[in-house]
Structures are given as structure tokens and as C-alpha cells.
Amino acid sequence: MKQLQILLAVLFLSNAAFAAEGQHLFILSGQSNMGGLKPEESFIPTVEKEFGKENVIVVKDAHGGQPIRRWYKKWKSAKGEAFKGAGDLYVRLMGKVNAAIKGQKIQTVSFSWMQGERDAREKHSAVYAASLQGILDQLAADLGRKDINFVIGRLSDFDMQNKRYPHWTAIRKIQVDFADASPRGAWVDTDDLNDGKNRRGKDISNDLHYSAKGYVEFGRRLAVSSIALIKGKKVSAGDK
């Protein structure tokens, strides 16, 4: 009994120490495949198991079928064309983030991003990397931090021949290169998540969207990679 009391005391003190240092903020955003992710299925349980429920804040805001210009305020096409209303979804996202962190001390910030399908279809790969950096710069400025970790969900193997989405493989490569180039970045593989049965019970194979089980695994992979980065470990997509 005494040993149990000591163990409980140690666990309590550990959690109290985490709380004193601040909350771990996880921001999830993107288009439809982020929209299909239910954080409560695997992402939240994974990060709460690692850091404690009381030390975690998770904010998700996604919108299906949208290009990256709706998050990046200064987006321009390769021809220099601007987009009216650029960044409106980022503003919506930050509205949720600011409400969630009001009065909280934030220890770490992790950004999970699943997007790129629309830009692949519209052939905007030439400005995709700059747009990713632009979003991270916006987050850094708005949150007053230079230590934001990020995890990118790489586009799946849906259109490896670039038939329907001409820049599909180009954006896949950009996502990998962008994450690999940063000590605070990681990417997760989604090639095995779009087969099986979707949430409506329909059989799918190499689909644009993920299976019901695929979304659960996707959330877990994002969480595992986020945790590793918080601990200062550089992870690869193979670390599933």
C-alpha cells in the first residue's frame, strides 16, 4: 500500500510539473482529409497518454476542397497573381486557437497540416513550398514563438500518374523536402490509409480520401510524430 501511495505521489508531482511549465498546444488544419480526421479517435488519446489530459490543448479547423491560399495571407501564383480573400481560413483557425489558449501558458506548439490536393489539381506546385513557409511564419508571428514544430501529411498514392491532379507527385515531393529540411519538421506517410471501407461502409482502393481505419491511424501517426518532435527527435515517415 505504501509503495502504491508513493507511486501515485510521483505521478501527481510529474503532472503538476508539466502543468507548471505550460500546456502543449496542438493545431490541426487542412482540407478534406484533415476534415475527416476525428481527433478524439486516436490523436487526442495518444498525446494525452504522453503528457496528461490536463496538459494538452487540441484545436482542429479544416475545410474540404480548399487551396493553400485560403490559409496563406500573402499568397501569389507563379505569375504574381494575388487572391482576394487569401488567408480567410487561417483567420478562422486562429479565432479558435486564441479562444482555446486564452489565459493559458503554452509550453510547446505543434502544427499538423493535411492539404495539397486542390493545389495539385490547379497546378500551383511552384508556389507551394513558399506558401507552407508563409503559414508557419504567420503562426510564429501570431503566437510569438520561433519554436513551432510541424507535421505534414504527405499526399497519398491516389494519383501517382498525375492524370486528374497534374501536380500530384510534385506536391508530394515538396511536402517531403520541406519537412526534411527543417529540424522541427516531419511528414507522415498516407499511402496505406486509403484502402478498405470508408466511414459510409463503402469499399475503397487508392481513394482520394481515407478509410475509416485509415483516419484513425492517420491521427495516431500525426500524434506520434508531434510527440517525437517535442522531445527533440527527428522522425521519418517509416517510424509508424
Regions found by a protein language model. Name each.
Residues K2-A9:
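Sec-dependent signal peptide recognition
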Residues V10-F18:
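Hydrophobic h-region of N-terminal signal peptides that target proteins for export
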Residues A20-K240:
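Cell-envelope and extracellular/periplasmic
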